[in-house]
């Protein structure tokens, strides 16, 4: 989530993460208005609710807290974080969740598997050629398309052009898309070197 948000946004709420506690699950959402991130984990909940807190300070608290369970307590204007194993607590100012941009939930989306190594190689061979000119949006990401049994990634900044192909056997057809570099950089950083990853193009 921290890699998705931006502290340079004129919209302060985009520097926050949205935290939702419901159905014995804690869901965290983040967005920079272009890229969206959602993850969930099982938790014990005494009272359901939601709020937003400043992501960088929250991550600083987590990185400086002992390992183990933590307790989150929310009131109207703050969130209190208490590591169970240590007699200390942290407080963060919060903003109401109704100010946070809507992040759509897509059910029954068809995912397909691809070799993580192959996908990361495709990213490395194209991402360097992406334009950083925000006035030419179609050049600020990598074009991703399936043509027959071939997956193709293409990137250009108007001067350089990079194109890479990989076999797409057993991969279903999908609508071509421009993938933002922030997503691709995150995949490069966190995707495993071996095994497969799942992708859905909506």
Functional labels for PLM-detected ranges:
Residues 1-202:
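Structural preference for solvent-exposed beta-strand-turn elements
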